Amino acid sequence: MLQQESRVRVADNSGAREILVIRVLGGSVKRSAGIGDVVVATVKEAAPGGTVKENEIVRAVIVRTKKPTRRPDGSYIAFDENAAVIIKANDNDPRGTRIFGPVARELREKKFMKIVSLAPEVL
């Protein structure tokens, strides 16, 4: 679970390496973000020459969390790091062209099909 001021690694090739969560979207007082939730964030660390620059405000979807997420069958899924993919402001398509590392199956249920199709592995 991620909240305001959480630092998250970026799992795509948009140019950003790390983002800081500003706000969790959805609901009037939603405090924490899990897998598949959209957040507004600022880029804290970026690669030179990338499409995303430092201090830019972006939207991102959470694709991996350290906190275990419970699935309907009773199993849990957890990852070694917190990671997000930067998406376009007007739709749910990623700004990068590649996704690094596995993503959770919950993204398919939340209609992030482009991210699921680009990911090397869906767990």
UniProtKB/Swiss-Prot annotation:
SUPFAM superfamilies, alphabetized = Ribosomal protein L14 (SSF50193)
Q: Does the keyword Ribosomal protein apply?
A: yes
Q: Does the keyword RNA-binding apply?
A: yes
Q: Name one GO biological process term.
A: translation
- GO annotations of cellular component type: cytosolic large ribosomal subunit
Instruction: Name one molecular function that GO assigns to this entry.
Output: large ribosomal subunit rRNA binding
Q: Which Pfam families match?
A: Ribosomal_L14 (PF00238)
- List keywords of the entry alphabetically: Ribonucleoprotein, Ribosomal protein, RNA-binding, rRNA-binding
**Cross-referenced InterPro entries:** Ribosomal_uL14 (IPR000218), Ribosomal_uL14_bac-type (IPR005745), Ribosomal_uL14_CS (IPR019972), Ribosomal_uL14_sf (IPR036853)
Q: Which NCBIfam families match?
A: rplN_bact (TIGR01067)
Stated family: Belongs to the universal ribosomal protein uL14 family.
**Entry-linked PANTHER family:** 50S/60S RIBOSOMAL PROTEIN L14/L23, LARGE RIBOSOMAL SUBUNIT PROTEIN UL14M
UniProt subunit comment: Part of the 50S ribosomal subunit. Forms a cluster with proteins L3 and L19. In the 70S ribosome, L14 and L19 interact and together make contacts with the 16S rRNA in bridges B5 and B8.
Q: What does this protein do?
A: Binds to 23S rRNA. Forms part of two intersubunit bridges in the 70S ribosome.
Q: What name does UniProt use for this protein? A: Large ribosomal subunit protein uL14
Please tell me the species this chain comes from.
Corynebacterium urealyticum (strain ATCC 43042 / DSM 7109)
Q: Tell me what gene encodes this.
A: rplN
